Design a protein with these regions (language model features):
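Ser/Thr/Pro/Gly-rich low-complexity disordered regions
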Residues: 1-207
Length: 207
């Protein structure tokens, strides 16, 4: 007998306590001369109703170019899961406006290596996780989005001196070969300081 279940209706618990068990009702009728008859209904198995997994997925690690971030699903649980083991699938997504997100090709593992170039700098990154419980029920979770920070990249190339290096001549610092991937508009700003040395080792600024 189910404790206190003695009325004509019964509210099946919304947790998993009776899922997959069998339920029946015993009814005893009493007539006007106190004759009693006991009847049992046909038993029926209590079916599961899909419960959404709870809690959230969190992105851990520095969200910056060149870094590797991880989808932390340790807090996600599902009462439908009999063995306590959820299966997760992952899809990393990016957005330019933090509103419309697109899947990143082949980014389907629990970790994601943010490119070390500028392709995702200032864009927004999130991960979509789908959990599947032992009964086949699925829940989709989205992490909070994070803006990808820039990491300072050194300018590449060399400065060269052009012109004849002789007394009375004018020489020029040629910086045309210097580039920097951090520079969005392609225009670098340069400052200059000419220096001289007597031994080609110790140099001093020229006033």
């Amino acid at each position: 007998n189910i404790d206190s279940a003695t009325s004509s209706s019964y509210a099946i618990p919304s947790d998993q306590t009776l899922v997959d068990k069998y339920l029946r009702i015993q009814v005893i009728s009493t007539d006007s001369i106190d004759g009693m008859t006991t009847k049992l209904s046909t038993s029926q198995q209590v079916t599961n109703v899909e419960d959404e997994a709870t809690d959230a997925v969190i992105i851990t690690g520095a969200v910056e170019e060149g870094a590797t971030v991880t989808a932390d699903v340790s807090g996600i649980a599902d009462v439908d899961d009999d063995d306590g083991i959820l299966v997760f699938t992952y899809q990393w997504q990016s957005s330019s406006d933090n509103s419309s997100f697109s899947n990143i090709d082949s980014a389907i593992s629990s970790t994601y290596a943010i490119p070390s170039d500028q392709t995702l700098v200032d864009k927004y990154l999130r991960v979509q996780v789908i959990s599947t419980d032992s009964r086949g029920g699925t829940t989709t979770k989205l992490s909070a989005s994070h803006q990808v920070a820039n990491v300072e990249d050194e300018a590449v190339g060399n400065v060269t001196i052009t012109g004849t290096v002789e007394e009375g001549a004018t020489v020029t610092a040629d910086v045309s070969g210097i580039t920097d991937v951090d520079d969005d508009d392609g225009i670098l700003v340069f400052t200059y300081q000419w220096q001289s040395s007597s031994d080609n080792s110790s140099f001093s600024n020229i006033d």
